[in-house]
């Protein structure tokens, strides 16, 4: 096993390339998504192995609703299957399941399963697995600002406007207690952030790989971690 002196506390991955992976094999796109979810299980075990505390994955974006209805229905079924059959395994490994994103457009039964999974695993403390479903970075910021407005945080006792601070917005994000991603990996050779963790990624390091998500394995993870270990994170400052 490779050992690292510096490990990201929060690793995030854009799970990209499932459809193209399936197409190259002459299979339906949903076969790629199914294989991608299987790989999520394998990668989660690696997260524990390498001592990464927070692991978030971009599973379904706010823009993914524009995909064909059959594909969306298939993805929702896969999410149900994952929660029904894999949550107990994650919990047994010390993992806490959490979700980020809006829930008003998701099927009611899926939302119920998500809430139950969060409740069942809330006392696990080895690592957090964060599934971003119906998540969009812009939407998250809008929701945070609207929460501040509806909560009266933008009005003082005299009725005058009170400026919003970074701390205010941070405290109203979907998961305000989760640290910002240290390293964001995007698979499949695309070079875009795609609306993922927009607020939280201001000083995240990025690692891009041509490998499709279903083929992402331990060797690829090690490459990303080695790259991260060699980064000089200055956060806008300079070395003395």
Which ranges hold each PLM region?
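Flexible, compositionally biased loop and terminal segments
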Residues: 1-240
